A protein has these predicted regions:
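Phosphate/dinucleotide-binding and metal-coordinating scaffold of catalytic cores
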Residues: 1-203
C-alpha cells in the first residue's frame, strides 16, 4: 500500500477540509474555503470554524484529532483490519493515521468520508451466520489464525467499533448489524442484549 500524503475530508459530497501530517507525525487540518463560508465546525473545541491550519497535540489521540479518531476502527474492527493487512503482506505498524483513514474511506458509520478511498468492505446479502460465528471464535482463539474468516469479516464491514465480532448484512433490502459472541460472553448474550434494547426503547 502506497503511503498517503493528504486526505480529503468529505461530508455529503462536500469538501470539509484536508488532512496532512507534520514532520513530527502530528495531524494538520485546514477547512476548505467553501466550507468556511457555508459549513459548520466538525469539532467545536478542537477545530472551530475559521481559516488557518490546526495542529493536533501528541495526546490523547496519538497525534490526531478526536473527531477523526472516532472514525477509525477499534476493538474487533481493528483486530480484523490488522489481520487482513498482515495476510496481504502489509505491516500494520507501518501505516500512518492518513493511511488508516483512507482504509475507512466511505465505509465508516459516521457522516464523514475520506478520500482517496482505499476501503475494502462491500455490501453483501444474508450469509451463513453459524459459520461466521465459528470463524469469529477461531479468530479470537489464535493470534496466528489465517483462515477465510479474516477476509469475510473485513469485506462485511470490519470497521464498526466495539469489542464483539460483528458484520453488516442486507436482508429484504434493509441493512442489519449482526453481532456474535466474544470469547468470554455467556451463551445467551444475544437474548440479553435484545432485552436491554427493549428496555432502552421504553426509557
Amino acid at each position: 500500500m502506497n503511503s498517503i500524503n493528504q486526505i480529503e475530508v468529505i461530508y455529503h459530497n462536500r469538501l470539509v477540509g484536508r488532512l496532512a501530517l507534520t514532520k513530527d507525525n502530528l495531524c494538520a487540518f485546514e477547512y476548505s474555503a467553501e466550507w468556511q463560508n457555508s459549513g459548520f465546525s466538525i469539532s467545536p473545541f478542537e477545530l472551530p470554524l475559521r481559516s488557518g491550519v490546526f495542529i493536533a497535540k501528541s495526546r490523547p489521540f496519538d497525534g490526531g484529532f478526536g473527531v477523526f479518531d472516532d472514525c477509525l476502527p477499534d476493538g474487533w474492527g481493528l483486530l480484523i483490519l490488522d489481520r487482513y493487512l498482515q495476510q496481504n503482506g502489509i505491516n500494520p505498524r507501518t501505516l500512518s493515521l492518513l493511511d488508516r483513514l483512507a482504509l475507512v474511506g466511505s465505509t465508516g458509520r459516521g457522516a464523514l468520508e475520506f478520500r482517496p478511498d482505499k476501503s475494502v468492505t462491500s455490501e453483501q446479502d444474508y450469509s451463513d451466520f453459524e459459520e461466521l460465528a465459528l470463524e469469529a471464535e477461531r479468530i479470537l482463539s489464535s493470534e496466528d489464525y489465517a483462515g477465510k474468516g479474516i477476509d469475510e469479516f473485513q469485506y462485511r464491514g470490519g470497521s464498526p467499533g466495539g469489542a464483539r465480532p460483528k458484520i453488516f448484512t442486507r436482508h429484504e433490502n434493509k441493512e442489519w448489524l449482526v453481532k456474535f459472541r466474544a470469547k468470554h460472553d455467556p451463551k445467551n448474550i444475544g437474548a440479553l442484549e435484545y432485552e436491554y434494547s427493549l428496555l432502552a426503547k421504553k426509557c
